[in-house]
């Protein structure tokens, strides 16, 4: 394969990746948008998101206590970092993301799972190897 066609293939793949990552956010929210009656906000959002990600990891062959083996940040630290990210996003005039999608609007369980980090082979194999 020539260099130019390789470059074109990589550029096309990158373009498709960027397009897919932006298409997952269906809404744009404003600061004064009210919360959806069935939306999850604040610590409820954090807890539910963490629960769904752990369930998805377990379903794909990981374990719920895999964080200790991979030296993942503690749940309290993740929660603080997540809440600070939500506050930073709220300062913007229009924002997208899990707070907009699942607090101001209603998210299905599958939409919550879409915000989970991908389960890698190393996370599944390291938990089963111990």
Swiss-Prot record:
Function of the protein: This venom insulin, from a fish-hunting cone snail, facilitates prey capture by rapidly inducing hypoglycemic shock. Intraperitoneal injection of this peptide into zebrafish lowers blood glucose with the same potency than human insulin. In vivo, when applied to water, this peptide reduces overall locomotor activity of zebrafish larvae, observed as a significant decrease in the percentage of time spent swimming and movement frequency.
GO CC entries: extracellular region
GO molecular function: hormone activity; toxin activity
Signal peptide region: 1-24
Protein family per UniProt: Belongs to the insulin family.
Keyword vocabulary terms for this entry: Carbohydrate metabolism, Cleavage on pair of basic residues, Disulfide bond, Gamma-carboxyglutamic acid, Glucose metabolism, Hormone, Hydroxylation, Secreted, Signal, Toxin
BP terms from Gene Ontology: glucose metabolic process
Residue positions, PTM 4-carboxyglutamate: 111
Bridged cysteine pairs (disulfide): 29-100, 41-103, 53-116, 102-107
Tissue expr: Expressed by the venom gland.
Taxonomic lineage: Eukaryota, Metazoa, Spiralia, Lophotrochozoa, Mollusca
Propeptide: 59-92
Extra remark beyond the main annotation: Venom insulins constitute about 1/25 of the total venom of C.geographus.
Protein name as it appears in the record: Con-Ins G2
């Amino acid at each position: 394969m020539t260099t130019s066609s390789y470059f074109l293939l990589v550029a096309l793949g990158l373009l498709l990746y960027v397009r897919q990552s932006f298409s997952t956010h269906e809404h744009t929210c404003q600061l004064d948008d009210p919360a959806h009656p069935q939306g999850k906000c604040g610590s409820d959002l954090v807890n539910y998101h963490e629960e769904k990600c752990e369930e998805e990891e377990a379903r794909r062959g990981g374990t719920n206590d895999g964080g200790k083996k991979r030296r993942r940040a503690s749940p309290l630290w993740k929660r603080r970092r997540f809440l600070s990210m939500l506050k930073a996003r709220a300062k913007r005039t229009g924002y997208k993301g899990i707070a907009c999608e699942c607090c101001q609007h209603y998210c299905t369980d599958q939409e919550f799972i879409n915000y989970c980090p991908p389960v890698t082979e190393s996370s599944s194999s390291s938990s089963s190897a111990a």
